[in-house]
Swiss-Prot record:
Superkingdom in the source lineage: Eukaryota
Keyword Signal found: yes
PANTHER family reported for this sequence: OS03G0233200 PROTEIN
Signal peptide: 1-22
UniProt subcellular location: Cytoplasmic vesicle
GO cellular component: cytoplasmic vesicle
Function according to Swiss-Prot or TrEMBL: Taste-modifying protein; intensely sweet-tasting. It is 100000 times sweeter than sucrose on a molar basis.
Protein name as annotated: Thaumatin II
Disulfide bonds: 31-226, 78-88, 93-99, 143-215, 148-199, 156-167, 171-180, 181-186
UniProt keyword annotations, A-Z: Cytoplasmic vesicle, Disulfide bond, Signal, Taste-modifying protein
SUPFAM superfamilies (alphabetical): Osmotin, thaumatin-like protein (SSF49870)
Length: 235
């Protein structure tokens, strides 16, 4: 009886401790080329905000519970000086190595909000285009991962091809309400259908059918760039 009473007394504190723990994100580059990983919540960096990852390297960051609207992405073809200032052909975030804001399209985005009423919400988005294949999966149990690893760049419609590489979203290219959904009312287009056909688990436009995955609060995650390269290597 005493043990049961003690458990019920401690349970709220144990639950609070679990939900107040920072989530661990392991960011892995399995591409054959160097990428510059970035992590931001739009108005501030997440952890250090960015880091160069050569092929096969990884970077682990801690993200505070309650974080909303966090994003992780890869930048390509970057140059930075010793002060951490420079430029990237895709995903550039104001010329900084350590991103404080989101990157410039095209970018494949791993998006998340943590510990929202005890749940985490994760997704991959092509709403800002596509530059690097990606897998976004939990490393703890309780939910599935999502992936967008198709050859979108190779099959990109001519009008969406980005000069610096990658495949732009239609809103970035055409800047119309049809593609940007500025009125709050829009449907799929030929371009969003292109992204959806190749990556059905990823958001293809603002009002896309729900593709968010719900995970237990305080889960840990892994974001892998070029995940199929890892699978081929392991065969």
């Amino acid at each position: 009886m005493a043990a049961t009473t003690c458990f019920f007394f401690l349970f709220p504190f144990l639950l609070l401790l679990t939900l107040s723990r920072a989530a661990t994100f392991e960011i892995v580059n399995r591409c054959s080329y160097t990428v510059w990983a970035a992590a931001s919540k739009g108005d501030a960096a997440l952890d250090a905000g960015g880091r160069q990852l050569n092929s096969g390297e990884s970077w682990t960051i801690n993200v505070e519970p309650g974080t909303k609207g966090g994003k992780i992405w890869a930048r390509t073809d970057c140059y930075f000086d010793d002060s951490g200032r420079g430029i990237c052909r895709t995903g550039d975030c104001g010329g900084l190595l350590q991103c404080k804001r989101f990157g410039r399209p095209p970018t494949t985005l791993a998006e998340f909000s943590l510990n929202q009423y005890g749940k985490d919400y994760i997704d991959i988005s092509n709403i800002k285009g596509f530059n690097v294949p990606m897998d976004f999966s939990p490393t703890t149990r309780g939910c599935r991962g999502v992936r967008c690893a198709a050859d979108i760049v190779g099959q990109c419609p001519a009008k969406l091809k980005a000069p610096g590489g990658g495949c732009n979203d239609a809103c970035t290219v055409f800047q119309t309400s049809e593609y940007c959904c500025t009125t709050g009312k829009c449907g799929p287009t030929e371009y969003s259908r292109f992204f959806k056909r190749l990556c059905p688990d990823a958001f293809s436009y603002v009002l896309d059918k729900p593709t968010t995955v719900t995970c237990p609060g305080s889960s840990n995650y892994r974001v892998t760039f070029c995940p199929t390269a890892l699978e081929l290597e392991d065969e």
